[in-house]
UniProtKB/Swiss-Prot annotation:
Belongs to the G-protein coupled receptor 1 family. The chain crosses the membrane at residues 20-44, 55-78, 93-117, 134-157, 189-212, 258-283, 291-314. The keyword Mitochondrion does not apply. It is a multi-pass membrane protein. One of its GO terms (biological process) is regulation of appetite. Residues 45-54, 118-133, 213-257, 315-388 are cytoplasmic. It holds the Pfam family 7tm_1. G-protein coupled receptor for 5-hydroxytryptamine (serotonin), a biogenic hormone that functions as a neurotransmitter, a hormone and a mitogen. Ligand binding causes a conformation change that triggers signaling via guanine nucleotide-binding proteins (G proteins) and modulates the activity of downstream effectors. HTR4 is coupled to G(s) G alpha proteins and mediates activation of adenylate cyclase activity. Interacts (via C-terminus 330-346 AA) with GRK5; this interaction is promoted by 5-HT (serotonin). This is 5-hydroxytryptamine receptor 4.
């Protein structure tokens, strides 16, 4: 998100060696973001099991937003930073800035939707999740991730609402004394800084924190319930009751998936929090934050656009397998073994006269799908499969 004079480079400029090092680093960041996000999109498009998981629709849309950042925003910022000049005109400066705000806001909205999807999947019963996350609702959420950011990007920026009261300061900072040229400067007044930051960062961040906290609490409670039922089931039936490894493994898988998404969200916040905190503070201290600091915070946020695909590769088994298949040219060694024809039993546990069905599950696309459908007669939400 190109804010204030975040793109303004040092008044002294860079030496030849510094320019080479800087250009190499920025090029690596851009290339990593392009290839990584393309890999995520191709993986989901080619892998049928990944396409079955509703969360991955948000992940693909997020990858597309990050891909657009790396193609439409970052290269022009890198060129200006290295050359110490903006050569594309004032109108394209406004367009690029609007795209920057739009795509950055869309990214965090996607992460917020992912956290809500995981909340309904893990904290609610399967029927509630199916009723909440219908194809129509998913489509509306995805549409909102792209449409709502337009009201804090293209609309106010093109109308000049962000620079009301600070036009003279903007004109002063646009001028490049070293080359008698201009920079692409984007400064914001106090109302826009507060509104944009609250809508684009602070409200979604609060929702994500609440959602993931509930997921953490629910996952711990589910694990405790499974252990209690397994221990109580053995003496009630008069014979040793083997541990329901499938149910336990399923819960571990869901918990690990939630932790993975928490790490992704945490990296996003670490990358963008310095920028958004400074974005609110700077207008109230007469815009005294150095341009170099803005540039550092801005590119720290850009790095996040290339970071998510690598988090998927290292932390998510299904994505890791899909990436290996693509990179290794469809090597058969990395394909999933077929689960067709497998017989997966259901184990039961009796407590105080009530029968609790612990559904055995098989792994499918990194998620766990039920292979039997008897109804449990107790509040054993932990034993219910999560349809994602």
């Amino acid at each position: 998100m190109d804010k204030l004079d975040a793109n303004v480079s040092s008044k002294e400029g860079f030496g030849s060696v510094e320019k080479v090092v800087l250009l190499t680093f920025l090029s690596a960041v851009i290339l990593m973001a392009i290839l990584g996000n393309l890999l995520v999109m191709v993986a989901v498009c080619r892998d049928r099991q990944l396409r079955k998981i509703k969360t991955n629709y948000f992940i693909v849309s997020l990858a597309f937003a990050d891909l657009l950042v790396s193609v439409l925003v970052m290269p022009f910022g890198a060129i200006e930073l290295v050359q110490d000049i903006w050569v594309y005109g004032e109108m394209f400066c406004l367009v690029r800035t609007s795209l920057d705000v739009l795509l950055t806001t869309a990214s965090i909205f996607h992460l917020c939707c992912i956290s809500l999807d995981r909340y309904y999947a893990i904290c609610c019963q399967p029927l509630v999740y199916r009723n909440k996350m219908t194809p129509l609702r998913i489509a509306l959420m995805l549409g909102g991730c792209w449409v709502i950011p337009m009201f804090i990007s293209f609309l106010p920026i093109m109308q000049g609402w962000n620079n009301i009261g600070i036009v003279d300061l903007i004109e002063k900072r646009k001028f490049n004394q070293n080359s008698n040229s201009t920079y692409c400067v984007f400064m914001v007044n106090k109302p826009y800084a507060i509104t944009c930051s609250v809508v684009a960062f602070y409200i979604p961040f609060l929702l994500m924190v609440l959602a993931y906290y509930r997921i953490y609490v629910t996952a711990k409670e589910h694990a405790r319930q499974i252990q209690v039922l397994q221990r109580a089931g053995a003496p009630a039936e008069g014979r040793p009751q083997p541990a329901d490894q499938h149910s336990t493994h399923r819960m571990r898988t869901e918990t690990k998936a939630a932790k993975t998404l928490c790490i992704i969200m945490g990296c996003f916040c670490l990358c963008w929090a310095p920028f958004f905190v400074t974005n609110i503070v700077d207008p109230f201290i007469d815009y005294t934050v150095p341009g170099q600091l803005w540039t550092a915070f801005l590119w720290l946020g850009y790095i996040n656009s290339g970071l998510n695909p690598f988090l998927y590769a290292f932390l998510n088994k299904s994505f890791r397998r899909a990436f290996l298949i693509i990179l290794c040219c469809d090597d058969e060694r990395y394909r999933r073994p077929s689960i067709l024809g497998q017989t997966v039993p259901c184990s039961t546990t009796t407590i105080n006269g009530s029968t609790h069905v612990l559904r055995d599950t098989v792994e499918c696309g990194g998620q766990w799908e039920s292979q039997c459908h008897p109804a449990a007669s107790s509040p054993l939400v932990a034993a219910q499969p999560i349809d994602t």
